[in-house]
Amino acid sequence: MIFDIHSHVLQKVDDGAKNLEEAIFIVKDLISQGVKKVLLTPHNIPQKYTSSTEELKSQFELLKEEINKQNLDISIYLGQEIYYTKLTLKKLEEKELLSLNNTNYVLIEFSYYNEPNIEEILYEFKLKNYKIILAHIERYRYLQDIQKIIHLKLSFRTFNSSKFFYNMR
């Protein structure tokens, strides 16, 4: 069973599906590739993609209804891909941002160029019982050293075609 944990299928909320019809087209394509479960992770990037949790949940329910109506064999779950700022943890605590399917896992994206103090951020999240999954690890020049990733105990999500994935084989 394939479980896609990072997708931009949810309609009208970021640079992913533009409407419900396009979202269903993407869902059908995922099914054709053997995906049985998909975590919808629309972007939250300040000043760019800032849909409220209410809007995300509303669009999620519309998509879920259409999937059920068309009797498509896939389960969907809701979360967000969150661009890290100093307010991220506070917003998670206040439910202004979404963890992955209401768990303590959070899909985080950092600046690709300016290295944050990842150890400190991981510690702060750990104190609040959150676990970070790093989106797009292949894009971070400062994390190309596998030993650094192991030291930080980072979980990550990457594309199969990424250079990093091939280097790990």
Where in the sequence are the language-model features?
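Extended substrate/RNA-proximal surfaces in nucleic-acid metabolism proteins
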Residues: 50-161
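Short beta-strands and strand-loop turn motifs
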Residues: 5-11, 38-43, 107-109, 132-135, ...
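An N-terminally biased module of ancient metal coordination in phosphate/nucleic-acid-related enzymes
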Residues: 1-73, 151-152
